[in-house]
Curated annotation (Swiss-Prot):
One of its GO terms (molecular function) is quinone binding. It catalyses: a quinone + NADH + 5 H(+)(in) = a quinol + NAD(+) + 4 H(+)(out). This is NADH-quinone oxidoreductase subunit E. Keywords: 2Fe-2S, Iron, Iron-sulfur, Metal-binding, NAD, Quinone, Translocase. Disulfide bonds: none annotated. Its cofactor is [2Fe-2S] cluster. Its EC number is 7.1.1.-. Belongs to the complex I 24 kDa subunit family. It comes from Aquifex aeolicus (strain VF5).
């Protein structure tokens, strides 16, 4: 059986093209496009990298390198909601360990794991750019300041 070439769905392709057209150089849209792909699929399908590289007029290994470099991109373990937890020094000093422990208590998983129902994955990241609100975490694109396990449980219940 012949393998067909991967194609983006029209809706996604249109969004990617809008991002590409926004910038003077196509390559400048790479992060926005990767976020768009991840938001659409829940992760970055490996077969999507070649068509994206073609759209951006970049070598495939450049796009692969960007995906590998940034820990905000998931290449596997599809989860509907990625909980990115800042583990930089400021957040660490302000209580990241308490946040991670609360997530483990509520979800029953450790960082890097996906809940059995496929809804949540805990992903430690280096910086979310919100040091004044430390410790911070994001559920997909929504940013939150961690205050307590009760507050965290309330936030996560919005995503079920």
């Amino acid at each position: 059986m012949f393998k067909t070439e991967f194609e983006f769905p029209e809706e996604l392709k249109t969004k990617l093209q809008e991002h590409i057209n926004y910038f003077p150089k196509k390559r400048q849209a790479i992060l926005l496009c990767l976020h768009e792909i991840q938001n659409y699929y829940g992760y970055i399908p490996p077969e999507s990298l070649k068509p994206l590289a073609d759209m951006l007029e970049l070598p495939l290994n450049h796009v692969e390198g960007v995906v590998a470099f940034y820990d905000m991109f998931d290449r596997e373990d599809k989860a509907k909601y990625r909980i990115r937890v800042c583990v930089s020094i400021v957040c660490h000093l302000m209580g990241t360990n308490k946040l991670l422990k609360a997530l483990e208590n509520i979800l029953g998983i450790k960082p890097g794991e996906v809940t059995p129902d496929g809804k949540f994955k805990i992903v430690p990241v280096q910086c979310l750019g919100a040091c004044s609100e430390a410790p911070v975490f994001m559920v997909n694109d929504d940013e939150y300041k961690f205050e307590s396990e009760v507050q965290l449980n309330e936030i996560l219940s919005r995503y079920t």
